[in-house]
């Protein structure tokens, strides 16, 4: 059978289910594919297939993730669902599957539980911009007041972590009913349809990488006699055009220069775009003025920083990480984009040590500046071996 052509005519949005174990994330994921296949004609995926999620490697970390796709009237959704709590932690911190919005699944019968809270906190830390709530198993709750109470609890919890709790859409229903094609009191199929319509309206269309301000991590520097200095790398976002000013940020004082040429596969171009590997010729910049690990950016868009708070996952021994815990004052290398910089770790109040396999918030102070923004991913390494993964939660200075 020939592969179907990937339709580019609908905007593409990445979502995922989050929430406490056994509250119905995977059932809802399967129900979404079923309802969308009937209403909008996308493919249906069964529960068992999603539940036995394949292993993936992201930054050397093993993560089990199931990817499904479904369509609404106006969009194409790529949806991630993880079987275990540890998989969520790793997934969100490494950014293996970055979400434009999350569906928080909470059982109406149980209310918010520890992982409900933890997933909301993680979403805040790693920069998931929007959360929509599906209050599941509502067919098991006869008391309308109880439903209202759970809804209030969820709203309070969202507000605690700086999400707009009062304005967050909450859909009440039963994923299992929808999966089985039932719809008593509009709690099954109708509720899931309502959820998809909510995703369409509440989660804005993500800005495409090409529309964001230009940024290219520098991987290599060459000097070409008679032409000047060329830096190479893969354009992360935006577009660089000839004769535009750019800044070189990180590791040293920020320098301004001008792009005088863009080359790709030995061909001269007028511009380099997001996703392309290219060489950028810099006017008046000497070979020794630039090094791997710096970034080329649109002037004024990204600043160099040394201190930030981060959410970090520490690899377990089985994943090839450390065999022993670390303590405050730990000084590993932080690998940002293309280079390592040594940094000092401050642990939260009352935390004495961090065990392999833990996730932890920490404050890091680097010995050199790095071009960084909230949401930037990094690896933690010791002598070239990855021992952790993290994301910048908030830049401090």
From Swiss-Prot:
Its EC number is 3.6.5.3. Its main location: cytoplasm. It is found in: Cytoplasm. It catalyses: GTP + H2O = GDP + phosphate + H(+). It comes from the Bacteria. This is Elongation factor Tu. It comes from Pseudomonas fluorescens (strain ATCC BAA-477 / NRRL B-23932 / Pf-5). PANTHER family: ELONGATION FACTOR TU, MITOCHONDRIAL, ELONGATION FACTOR TU-RELATED. GTP binds at residues 19-26, 81-85, 136-139. Monomer. NCBIfam families: EF-Tu, PRK00049.1, PRK12735.1, PRK12736.1, small_GTP. Residues 10-207 form the tr-type G domain. The lineage of its organism: Bacteria, Pseudomonadati, Pseudomonadota, Gammaproteobacteria, Pseudomonadales. Residues 136-139 are annotated as: G4. GO terms for molecular function: GTP binding; GTPase activity; guanosine tetraphosphate binding; translation elongation factor activity. It is an enzyme of class 3 (hydrolase).
């Amino acid at each position: 059978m020939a592969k179907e052509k990937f339709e580019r005519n609908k905007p593409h949005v990445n979502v995922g289910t989050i929430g406490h174990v056994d509250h119905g994330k995977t059932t809802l994921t399967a129900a979404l594919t079923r309802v969308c296949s009937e209403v909008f004609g996308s493919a249906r995926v069964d529960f068992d297939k999603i539940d036995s999620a394949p292993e993936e490697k992201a930054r050397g970390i093993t993560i089990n993730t199931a990817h499904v796709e479904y369509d609404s009237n106006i969009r194409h959704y790529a949806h991630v669902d993880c079987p275990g709590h540890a998989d969520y932690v790793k997934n969100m911190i490494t950014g293996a599957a970055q979400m434009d919005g999350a569906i928080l699944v909470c059982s109406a019968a149980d209310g918010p539980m520890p992982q409900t809270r933890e997933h909301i906190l993680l979403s805040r830390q790693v920069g998931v911009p929007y959360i929509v709530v599906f209050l599941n198993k509502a067919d098991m709750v006869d008391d309308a007041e109880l439903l209202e109470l759970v809804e209030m609890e969820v709203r309070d919890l969202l507000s605690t972590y700086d999400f707009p709790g009062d304005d967050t859409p909450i859909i009440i229903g039963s994923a299992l009913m929808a999966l089985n094609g039932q719809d008593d009191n509009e709690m099954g199929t109708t509720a899931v349809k309502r959820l998809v319509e909510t995703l369409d309206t509440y989660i804005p269309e993500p800005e495409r990488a090409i529309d964001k301000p230009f940024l290219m991590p520098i991987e290599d520097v060459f000097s070409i006699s008679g032409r000047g200095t060329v830096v190479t790398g893969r354009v992360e976002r935006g577009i660089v055009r000839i004769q535009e000013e750019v800044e070189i940020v990180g590791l040293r004082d920020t320098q301004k220069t001008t792009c005088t040429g863009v080359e790709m596969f030995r061909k001269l171009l007028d511009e380099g775009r997001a996703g392309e590997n290219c060489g950028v010729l810099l006017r008046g910049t000497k070979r020794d003025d630039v090094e791997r690990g710096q970034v080329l950016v649109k002037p004024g868009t990204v600043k160099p920083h040394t201190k930030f708070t981060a959410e970090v996952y520490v690899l377990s021994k089985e994943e090839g990480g450390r065999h022993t815990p670390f303590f405050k004052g730990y000084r590993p290398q932080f690998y940002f984009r293309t280079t390592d910089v040594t940094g000092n770790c401050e642990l939260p109040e009352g935390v004495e040590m961090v065990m392999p396999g833990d996730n932890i918030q920490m404050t890091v102070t680097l010995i050199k500046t790095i071009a960084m923004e909230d949401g930037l991913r990094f690896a933690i390494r010791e002598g070239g071996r990855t021992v952790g993964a993290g994301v910048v939660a908030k830049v401090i200075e």
